[in-house]
Design a protein with these regions (language model features):
Chain A
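P-loop/Walker-type NTP enzyme "switch/lid" segment
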Residues: 45-120, 176-177, 183-196, 209-211, ...
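Conserved C-terminal guanine-recognition region of P-loop GTPase G domains, centered on the G4
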Residues: 155-170
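Walker A/P-loop phosphate-binding motif and the immediately C-terminal alpha-helix
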Residues: 3-46
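Inter-motif core of Ras-like GTPase G domains
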Residues: 133-153
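NTP-binding/hydrolysis catalytic cores, primarily Walker-type P-loop NTPases
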Residues: 258, 272, 276-303
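Conserved nucleotide-binding/hydrolysis micro-motifs of P-loop NTPases
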Residues: 47-49, 96-98, 129, 151-154, ...
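Intrinsically disordered, low-complexity acidic Ser/Thr-rich regulatory segments
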Residues: 201-245, 254
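Beta-strand-loop-alpha "switch" segments that mediate conformational coupling across diverse proteins
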Residues: 225, 232-234, 252-281
């Protein structure tokens, strides 16, 4: 067996709005990474609404995530399926009732197993929304790609997701201080309407500083570490590309975090054609605008 | 106040966005989230356009909207939402209907609204000058042909405060997120 010497890089692909093209991007990005010679496994973690297999053209699967969740297999590696593509494996999503509300112990078991997978990249195709099950997989990932379209509802949901992510991460960290005042403060800061004096992250950090300076240092460190990349999908004009600037400004001012990169994916009819044929765009039309944009994202991930 | 557009949406954010973009386009709008209110508002305000956003609506609300939209003849009806849901509106009277599938595209909605309102104004002026009975139905029927020539609205579409203008977008986001 060839042992992969490099540590696995877990990449979370999130589309908080839903219907923004996240799964299409995940499927094709996994192929692009594999074509760059990276060993990749794409995992459908859109729990309860999985369909990554259809974007990869996989009609049936011997194993799914259900087998792992229901303890029918011991290790996640055992349910990795062949895709027929060199360097690329796939784990089909589960659809057992209640899987979307994955129990904490199951989630932890899954997270432990993700880190043990023998791949260069583990690509997680996560569900829409901002449930803790989605947020926690983003927290354990080395890189996260937030997919949005230029429309306001999608941008709003992306911001809300980021806010949930930031507060979830800060709550986890501040719990270690066993200081209820700090946790109460975080709770207050979530509600900017009732507590406008805490609406900016700088304001919150200053108040934390007065309570416990080491806690404020930790908060700053955590915020520096949250650097999602944003994928602006379905761009139709040069003006569409500006949509991310607004959310970046809000992220900086109110959440105290920065984007690591803004990546563009242009509107392209080849996506619809490929989906209709149940074939990935990277295979069906590798010279398309969409395929080129996906290759750019893969290049960003591989550094 | 003369209401030109009545919006129904049970999705607070989408409804708010629709109202805001139309308001900025100097269009008098009324946003409602109750179908019974929409019905009475249409008969009392006699708007030029009714926008039915089906997003987030329950099955019985979709049925009521379908019933209501098929009975409306006095104004233009724009139906927004998921393609699968919009399909149920496709039978019956289609001459005064426009279907726009998700994702919600403010630019298209503004463009179409301006086009419809402009045509209605034109037709009203024509009907008035020829001293004919100015019932709304013939005015609306002329809109069926509106794709034939470009409207003035298309020429300055870039001026529409769509989410592409960063300052406006940021201001909208602040408002919806209650950060102001």
């Amino acid at each position: 067996m060839v042992v992969n010497k490099n540590p696995v890089e877990i990449v979370a692909v999130i589309g908080p709005k839903g219907g923004v093209g996240k799964t299409s991007i995940s499927a094709n990005l996994a192929i692009s990474l594999a074509q760059l010679g990276k060993k990749v496994v794409a995992i459908d973690l859109d729990l309860g609404a999985s369909n990554l297999n259809t974007f990869l053209g996989i009609r049936s699967s011997k194993y799914t995530l259900d087998d792992f969740i229901l303890n029918k297999v011991g290790k996640l590696q055992e349910i990795v399926l062949e895709t027929g593509l060199e360097n690329m494996g796939f784990i089909c999503g589960g659809n057992i009732p209640g899987i979307a509300n994955l129990h904490y112990s199951k989630k932890m078991k899954l997270i432990r197993n993700l880190a043990m997978l023998d791949y260069d990249f583990v690509l997680l195709d996560l569900g829409a929304g901002a449930s803790y099950n989605v947020v926690d997989f983003v927290i354990i990932s080395q890189k996260s790609l937030l997919v949005t379209t230029p429309e306001i509802p999608s941008i709003l949901n992306t911001y809300s997701f980021l806010k949930t992510l930031v507060f979830r991460r800060l709550t986890m960290a501040l719990k270690e201080f066993h200081n209820q005042t700090l946790l109460d403060l975080l709770e207050q800061a979530r509600d900017v309407e009732k507590n406008p004096h805490l609406k900016r992250m700088d304001d919150l950090v200053q108040v934390i500083q007065k309570i416990d300076s080491s806690a404020s240092r930790l908060v700053k460190q955590i915020l520096l570490g949250i650097r999602p990349a944003m994928i602006l999908n379905r761009i139709r004009s040069g003006k569409d590309e500006k949509a991310c600037v607004a959310i970046e400004n809000l992220m900086r001012q109110y959440l105290g975090i920065e984007c690591s990169k803004i990546l563009h994916v242009h509107e392209d009819a080849s996506v619809g054609h490929a989906i209709a044929k149940m074939k990935p765009v990277m295979i069906n039309n590798p010279g398309s605008v969409f395929a080129n944009d996906i290759n750019e994202i893969a290049m960003f991930l591989t550094g | 106040m003369s209401v030109q557009v009545i919006i129904y949406s049970s999705d607070r954010i989408r409804g708010g966005i629709l109202r805001e973009i139309l308001r900025r386009n100097k269009t008098e709008t009324l946003l409602l989230d109750n179908i019974m209110d929409v019905k009475s508002a249409i008969s009392s305000h006699k708007p030029d356009i009714a926008i039915f956003d089906t997003s987030n609506s329950l099955k019985n609300e979709i049925n009521s909207l379908k019933h209501l939209s098929s009975s409306i003849e006095e104004c233009f009806v724009m139906i927004l939402g998921d393609a699968l849901i919009i399909n149920v509106f496709h039978d019956g009277n289609l001459w005064n209907k426009l279907f726009l599938t998700d994702p919600l595209d403010p630019e298209i909605i503004i463009s179409k609204s301006r086009e419809i309102l402009s045509r209605i104004q034109e037709n009203r002026a024509t009907v008035k000058s020829s001293d004919h009975d100015s019932t709304t139905a013939p005015v609306i029927r002329n809109i069926e042909n509106m794709e034939e020539k470009p409207s003035v609205a298309d020429e300055d579409i870039d001026l529409v405060d769509h989410n592409l203008d960063i300052e406006h977008l940021e201001s909208d986001l602040r408002q919806y997120l209650k950060l102001d």
